[in-house]
Amino acid sequence: MATTHFDGTDTPTSGELPAVGDTLPDFTVVDTNLGEVSLSDLKGKKLVLNIFPSVDTGLCAESVRRFNAEAAGLDNTTVLCVSKDLPFALGRFCGAEGLDNVTAASAFRSTFGEDYGVVLEGSPLKGLLARSVIVADEDGKVIYTQLVDEIKTEPDYASAIKALG
């Protein structure tokens, strides 16, 4: 079990992020059109997983905006933004913001959070996903991970993008 922080208070997660060098566990999440997206659908491209608690918080919304801006300049890369928000909320947000360089998806009916070790086990956000970033190569091998130490801070965008090569 890993630990992040919420307002400086230790907040355990349901497990550990996949380690650098590991193959990503398969997953299925739901996109904003209620279609299923699985890891196998994304093979052959590099993958950035932007994982966060809820797009209805300012910092989470900013992470989706920032990765959308970064994704515009990335070749052969999918940026998948995953939370437990309902697909309708994610779609409304991305539509209102004009975010079309990322794919927003919901883990509301999957074991994504448990399989990736990112379900928050404590704090007022218990049950939501911990802010984290995972980058994988075209074969699904993990090349970068970050469990953000304080939920109320942004991920290290530059390091995640740099890991793509």
UniProtKB/Swiss-Prot annotation:
Q: What is its EC number?
A: 1.11.1.24
Q: Which family is this protein grouped under?
A: Belongs to the peroxiredoxin family. Tpx subfamily.
Q: What else is known?
A: The active site is a conserved redox-active cysteine residue, the peroxidatic cysteine (C(P)), which makes the nucleophilic attack on the peroxide substrate. The peroxide oxidizes the C(P)-SH to cysteine sulfenic acid (C(P)-SOH), which then reacts with another cysteine residue, the resolving cysteine (C(R)), to form a disulfide bridge. The disulfide is subsequently reduced by an appropriate electron donor to complete the catalytic cycle. In this atypical 2-Cys peroxiredoxin, C(R) is present in the same subunit to form an intramolecular disulfide.
- UniProt-annotated catalytic positions: C60
The reply to whether Transferase figures as a keyword in the UniProt entry is no
| Enzyme superclass (EC) | oxidoreductase
What are the residue boundaries of the Thioredoxin domain, all occurrences included? 18-165
S-S pairs: C60-C94
- One Pfam family this chain carries? Redoxin
A GO MF annotation of the entry reads: thioredoxin peroxidase activity
Tell me where on the tree of life, at the top rank, the source sits: Bacteria
Keywords linked to the UniProt accession:
Antioxidant, Disulfide bond, Oxidoreductase, Peroxidase, Redox-active center
Query: Which chemical reaction does it catalyze?
Result: a hydroperoxide + [thioredoxin]-dithiol = an alcohol + [thioredoxin]-disulfide + H2O
This protein's assembly is summarised as: Homodimer.
Q: What is this protein called?
A: Thiol peroxidase
